[in-house]
Amino acid sequence: MLPYPQIDPVALAIGPLKIHWYGLMYLIGIGGAWLLASRRLNRFDPTWNREKLSDLVFWLSMGVIVGGRLGYVLFYDLHAYLANPTLIFEVWKGGMSFHGGFIGVMLAALWFGKRNNKSFFELMDFVAPLVPIGLGAGRIGNFINAELWGKPTDVPWAMIFPPFSDPAQLPRHPSQLYQFALEGVALFVILWLFSRKPRPTMAVSGMFSLCYGIFRFAVEFVRVPDAQLGYIAFGWLTQGQLLCIPMIVGGLVLIWWAYNRKPTAKPA
């Protein structure tokens, strides 16, 4: 069994002002995505400057934060937030939904693309390889917060999370680290290598959707479902897995479509 590192969720406190690691992980994810996007910008559109890229990253970040929070409220704990709506704004306590953030990013990309003469999938193909940086950073934030841990286990790398998080004090799968390894590291490597060669429009977006859906679906088998929801069906299907099914199917469809559709005829 491995010891859980006791890390204060508050990274820095100045008087009443507290800066949480969870929030810093979002800043790291956004900053890392911007740096990587800067490297890939010339291939994407040589006419774009850093200012336009910064605008894109800003609006996508708003999509992540607003969509992620509203997604958690709608998908995971609607009754609690309806009873006390002020809880919606306490983002530093956790409670973000990837699937909600994903929807927020898609809406932001759709809006930004229309304003800047870019198709939705052109932007999504450009953005997809940037996303694992934020996903990986977010999972480290979950780990520091001692939240979203896994089921009891006797594997050698099991961890006992703090009593405030797990009163049962059982050795558990550190599922946040599994997700960091898969959604952060593995997904980044796959998309980075896949997108290095020219791909038809929608292929990179499809690969992201497919791989994320598979990775998340797999980890959910060892992750404890949200207490207020439990299992949705069959005694094992979680809300996270249910939301991943359309991502897996959609990813397969996009990849097939990208490689099999007829090229659009260009006007003479």
Swiss-Prot record:
Gene Ontology molecular function: phosphatidylglycerol-prolipoprotein diacylglyceryl transferase activity
Presence of keyword Ribosomal protein: no
Membrane topology: Multi-pass membrane protein
Keywords (A to Z) from UniProt: Cell inner membrane, Cell membrane, Membrane, Transferase, Transmembrane, Transmembrane helix
Pathway(s) of this molecule: Protein modification; lipoprotein biosynthesis (diacylglyceryl transfer)
Residues that bind a 1,2-diacyl-sn-glycero-3-phospho-(1'-sn-glycerol): 139
Residues annotated as transmembrane: 10-30, 56-76, 92-112, 120-140, 174-194, 202-222, 236-256
InterPro entries: Lgt
An annotated GO cellular component: plasma membrane
Enzyme class: transferase
GO biological process, alphabetically ordered: lipoprotein biosynthetic process
EC identifiers of the protein: 2.5.1.145
One Pfam family it belongs to: LGT
Subcellular localization, as worded in the UniProt entry: Cell inner membrane
Protein origin, superkingdom: Bacteria
Function: Catalyzes the transfer of the diacylglyceryl group from phosphatidylglycerol to the sulfhydryl group of the N-terminal cysteine of a prolipoprotein, the first step in the formation of mature lipoproteins.
HAMAP family: Lgt (MF_01147)
NCBIfam families listed in its UniProt record: lgt (TIGR00544)
Similarity remark: Belongs to the Lgt family.
Protein name: Phosphatidylglycerol--prolipoprotein diacylglyceryl transferase
Gene that specifies this protein: lgt
